[in-house]
Design a protein with these regions (language model features):
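The beta1-alpha1 cofactor-binding region of Rossmann-like NAD(H)/NADP(H)-dependent oxidoreductases
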Residues: 41, 61-72, 104
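Substrate-binding pocket helix/loop in short-chain dehydrogenase/reductase
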Residues: 98-99, 106-109
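Active-site loop immediately N-terminal to the catalytic Tyr-X3-Lys motif
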Residues: 100, 149-153
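Conserved glycine-rich Rossmann-like NAD(P)H-binding loop of the short-chain dehydrogenase/reductase
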Residues: 29-46
Length: 158
């Protein structure tokens, strides 16, 4: 039996790339996945694939680059009667270019998603995991954080 069998796993940024692949793989390993991103069409497509595998998928559409979005997502998931055994903070993005070419809103949304919402979700779910007697948090990062990247100062620092 897989470690993930029966575990409820929340995956942010699940509409594409790493998050999409993680959701598929974890569902195949027996996890019940809770997927979130901005694009409902992609999440619904993924949920259909997961359900065809015989696993459960719960879809929550949320733009995690907005302030208070982590709290909103947490409350929606709780209201649906779901607990989270494993949180995978995968959502994130970067913009490249000279810092002076960005509007404040551009880098503020990047920092909100890559740092603040990630931290909010950890802060919200960690006490629940302690009460449950265990859990796990995986924060997906970028190699760009390990060394300076030209034209990506905000992304690299986040």
């Amino acid at each position: 039996m897989s470690f993930y069998q029966g575990k409820k796993v929340l995956i942010t940024g699940a509409s594409a790339g790493i998050g999409y692949a993680l959701a598929e793989e974890l569902a195949q390993l027996g996890a019940e996945v809770i997927i979130t991103a901005r694009r409902r069409d992609r999440l619904d497509e993924l949920a259909g694939k997961i359900e065809n595998l015989g696993a459960k998928a719960h879809v929550f559409v949320e733009d995690l680059s907005l302030p208070e979005s982590g709290t909103k997502l947490y409350n929606q998931i709780k209201s649906a009667g779901l607990s989270v055994d494993i949180l995978i903070n995968n959502a994130g993005y970067g913009r490249w270019g000279e810092l002076t070419s960005f509007e404040r809103d551009d880098y503020a949304k990047m920092l909100q998603l890559n740092v603040t919402t990630l931290t909010d979700l950890c802060h919200l779910y960690l006490p629940d995991m302690v009460v449950q007697g265990g859990g796990g948090i995986i924060n997906v990062g970028s190699m760009a954080s390990l060394s300076p990247v030209p034209y990506a100062s905000v992304y690299s620092s986040s």
